[in-house]
């Protein structure tokens, strides 16, 4: 049963194989922070979104990723040995779950063996949004400290201090324990406003 109004794309963002204003909705999670230039990657994919379309990105958070960064340092300090893999498997909350060997290996490679990794703050991504004609709708975590679905997000930014505190709280939640991924949601503005 094919869906004729959905397009999935697996390509190099920097080849920019998509025409501008093509998608109503762009979801790019777990990608930009593994590219040669996260901001440039965002600039490219933001052009793909139609006016009034939504864009959701998931990037590693500078603060929320600190626990993972600590485990990464241990893994590298122990020279990525078999012992290091076993130790990290005990320390990483996601790897302690009852997962298949394949899923554990995929998680391990993504979290500990990826050659390129960048981390970004919510404010940094909010600046990307502003520079690319995208209105900030919300994020997970957010400065109101309440979970909101995309349809409930109102663009409330809160204060800088509240945004920083929300990111610090990632260290004490499942968000920080499982990789420190931060979700940021925006809406493409009308070019003539």
Regions of interest found by a model, annotated:
Residues 6, 22-24, 133:
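Local beta-strand N-terminus motif with an aromatic residue
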Residues 24-38, 61:
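A short SAM/SAH-binding and catalytic strip from SAM-dependent methyltransferases
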Residues 32, 60-65, 141-142:
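Short "lid" loop at the C-terminus of a central beta-strand within the Rossmann-like core
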Residues 54-94:
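Conserved class I S-adenosyl-L-methionine
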Residues 14-26:
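A short acidic, Gly/Pro-enriched loop at the edge of an enzyme's catalytic core
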Residues 101-193:
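Rossmann-like AdoMet/SAM-dependent catalytic core
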Residues 2-15:
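Conserved SAM-binding strand-loop segment of SAM-dependent methyltransferases
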Residues 39-51:
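A short glycine-rich, Lys/Arg-flanked "PGG" loop and its adjoining helix->strand segment in the class I
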């Amino acid at each position: 049963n094919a869906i004729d109004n959905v397009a999935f794309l697996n390509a190099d963002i920097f080849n920019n194989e998509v025409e501008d204003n093509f998608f109503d909705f762009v979801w790019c999670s777990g990608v930009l922070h593994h590219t040669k230039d996260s901001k440039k990657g965002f600039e490219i994919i933001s052009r793909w979104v139609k006016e009034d379309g939504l864009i959701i990105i998931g990037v590693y958070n500078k603060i929320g990723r600190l626990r993972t960064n600590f485990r990464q340092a241990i893994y590298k300090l122990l020279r990525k040995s078999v012992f290091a893999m076993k130790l990290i498997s005990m320390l990483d909350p996601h790897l302690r779950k009852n997962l298949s060997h394949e899923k554990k290996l995929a998680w391990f490679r993504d979290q500990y063996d990826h050659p390129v990794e960048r981390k970004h703050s919510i404010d940094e991504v909010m600046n990307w949004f502003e520079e690319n004609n995208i209105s900030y709708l919300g994020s997970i975590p957010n400065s109101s400290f309440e979970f909101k679905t995309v349809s409930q997000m109102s663009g409330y930014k809160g204060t800088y201090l509240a945004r920083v505190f929300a990111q610090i709280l990632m260290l004490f939640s499942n968000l920080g324990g499982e990789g420190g991924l931060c979700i940021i949601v925006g809406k493409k503005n009308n070019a003539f406003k």
